[in-house]
Amino acid sequence: YTSGTTGYSKGVMLPYRSIWSNVAYCFEMLPVKPGDHIVSMLPMGHVFGMVYDFLYGFSAGAHIYFLTRMPSPKIISQSFSEIKPRVISCVPLIVEKIIKKDILPKVDSKIGKLLLKVPIVNDKIKSLARQAAMEIFGGNFDEIIIGGAPFNAEVEAFLKKIGFPYTIAYGM
């Protein structure tokens, strides 16, 4: 079903070739190999969740982990540290909450802001912030794919600044 942006929700038929072309694209562009881990957080009723988290992961021989509880930042962080997923796909709110809770307070402190103004120290602080963010998300991933809603501009600017590997996904 579509979300009904131009009216009421309505069913949409997706042909096999459309779904398979997306799976084939994933094989070309995303680094999942047999035995890699995927944490499924997106709804299976959402095309991206079904294609990437399930069909592509299954076809690639990855191990797919489904969260059985409502995903909170704490549950997600624990899951990522145990599972160590290769590529992560999620909605912006998950990344925003984790970054705002665990990383930004350290960098936005008085001393953090002061150190970010010192050229050589600036690079070290950004590197440490990037490494801390990578560890929160399992420390084993190549990229986080974020989509399904607008992304917080402050968090996005911060992730760009520290060189964090992410992609904003958009689909129709």
Located regions from the model:
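Thr-Gly-centered strand-to-loop micro-motif
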Residues: M41, L67, I146-G147, I168
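Conserved AMP-binding A3 loop
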Residues: Y1-V23
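Gly/Ser/Thr-rich helix-start
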Residues: T5-Y8, V12, M50, A149, ...
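Conserved AMP-binding/adenylation subdomain of ANL enzymes
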Residues: W20-H37, M44-Q131, N140, K161-P165
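A conserved hydrophobic position in a structured secondary element of the catalytic/binding core
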Residues: L14, C90, F151
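Conserved S/T- and glycine-rich ATP-binding loop of Class I adenylate-forming
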Residues: T2-T5, I38, I88, L159, ...
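Conserved A3 ("GATE") glycine/threonine-rich loop of ANL adenylate-forming enzymes
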Residues: L93, G147-V155, T167-M172
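Alpha/beta-hydrolase fold catalytic core
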Residues: Q131-I136, F141-A149, A153-K161
